[in-house]
Amino acid sequence: HLTLQKGKTWCELSAKNNYFFFLLEGALIVDFNECVGYEVGKGEMIYLPRSADFKIFAKESADLIILSYGIPVQLCDKLSLSQLGAFITDFKYEFKSLDIRVPLDTFLKLLVKYLDSGMSCQHMHELKQKELFLILRAYYTKEEKVNFFYHSIAASLTFKDKVMGVYLEARTVQELADKCGYGLKTFQRLFYSCFSE
């Protein structure tokens, strides 16, 4: 839970995580990759994938919740991001926010209460991540989710294509990582993220 004062710029994200920004009050101007000057208002959310090139500017004082994750907690096949990959073909991506709708607004109000009272442990964060993905699955359309998570879905598909194209030529994990153009640790992290679903 964070307050960003009017006129302040924020860009302190880790390249290892994906981020949800939920704007409870105020207005932000977001520069994200090719999209410059996108305005996010009260009651909207945006998603920034790991290693995103971005800048966030507070047009008005902003009250926001920032949730981050490295690899999404696995729920079930119907909730995995990779399942949305089937809908990405011939899809026209446009960076845009999503409205925070019922029951996501209630989820966020309760989350603020938890955080403001100092309740912040790994178990609570994992539970809330699961709950968030359940809400997104049930209350947002496939088209909205594909557009919202487009960069993560596309990156996952690209990695998967690389692996599937060369895996028969590799005898070890290190060889497979080399053939795909990654260091071993990065390859293992991406592999787990892509294929653990």
What are the functions of these language-model segments?
Residues 1-89:
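N-terminal regulatory/effector-sensing and dimerization cores
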Residues 11, 90-99, 147, 175:
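A ubiquitous short alpha-helical element
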Residues 138, 170, 174-197:
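Basic/polar phosphate-binding segments, predominantly the helix-turn-helix DNA-binding elements
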Residues 101-113, 126-129, 145-171, 175-180:
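A short, Lys/Arg-enriched amphipathic alpha-helix from helix-turn-helix/homeodomain DNA-binding modules
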Residues 80-135, 161:
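Amphipathic alpha-helical segments enriched in hydrophobic/aromatic residues interleaved with Lys/Arg
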Residues 28, 136-141:
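Short alpha-helix boundary/capping elements
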Residues 140-147, 195:
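Short, Lys/Arg-enriched N-terminal segment that forms or immediately precedes the first helix
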